[in-house]
Swiss-Prot record:
Family the UniProt entry places it in: Belongs to the G-protein coupled receptor 1 family.
Membrane topology: Multi-pass membrane protein
Protein name listed in UniProt: C-X-C chemokine receptor type 2
Cited PROSITE patterns: G_PROTEIN_RECEP_F1_1, G_PROTEIN_RECEP_F1_2
Originating species: Pan troglodytes
Organism placement in taxonomy: Eukaryota, Metazoa, Chordata, Craniata, Vertebrata
Amino acid sequence: FNMESDSFEDFWKGEDLSNYSYSSTLPPFLLDAAPCEPESLEINKYFVVIIYALVFLLSLLGNSLVMLVILYSRVGRSVTDVYLLNLALADLLFALTLPIWAASKVNGWIFGTFLCKVVSLLKEVNFYSGILLLACISVDRYLAIVHATRTLTQKRYLVKFICLSIWGLSLLLALPVLLFRRTVYSSNVSPACYEDMGNNTANWRMLLRILPQSFGFIVPLLIMLFCYGFTLRTLFKAHMGQKHRAMRVIFAVVLIFLLCWLPYNLVLLADTLMRTQVIQETCERRNHIDRALDATEILGILHSCLNPLIYAFIGQKFRHGLLKILAIHGLISKDSLPKDSRPSFVGSSSGHTSTTL
């Protein structure tokens, strides 16, 4: 998931790029950029800034509330609660980088190489960890509902190990960003936070595009489809009081995941094929790809503020947990608390079959 602060592809007018001799004034790793006249994107830039700001605020509020409720619910905290706590942290940390990326959309990258590396690393780590945690949640729901038994992941030390492993793997996958990203300066182009890999940029870019699409989308998607597919089949066969509600939540999980990430990954694949000259690059195609990347990237960013809605606000237990916190601090009357309010807002994964997320 590469959120590039500026587009370098278009500098001069032209249609067929096959015979073009690229300007030597550009950095070596930008020589694969298409010499096209960029379309006016000033309105789009400010529109993106507004979207980033809204997502930042919603994600900050939503994920903070999720973390607050889970941390308060020490008694009866389930495996899924632990995953959701880490997921909320990942989305929250990702959201904290949005103001910097928003500023770079307007002014270019003015924050220097050190912050370029740090912010890019933080963004990538939390992107990978968020997606991998979603897959872990689907596995936990699969084990709890389909097998309806106490799983090995119920052991606290193992759950902590899984979460630490996810963060470690995410850091490992994000290391190329830390190594190769720097502030890029070029004539007539705003400075940007971009990968500098020397003369092998095209080959490295292909590898760095395959990694996030594989580990950040395809593999988690296959895991989610497998787990939720069998979970739905079990719910169809079973006669559970909350079956229909659980089905709506599961459908929402898969649907929102697809809506947010499938368009971006498809466009990213087309962009990779064009940059590596598998598909011939023209100015018209480049402009179409750039616009599509900007639009679908916003969908991916929106996912960070939708997670609290999908995994928490739909469930009654989250609302009960939040009401408990408000009652403890005297903000509401304890009489207004539901009688069946429980500490865990996603359901336990041990001893019984939970049908809510």
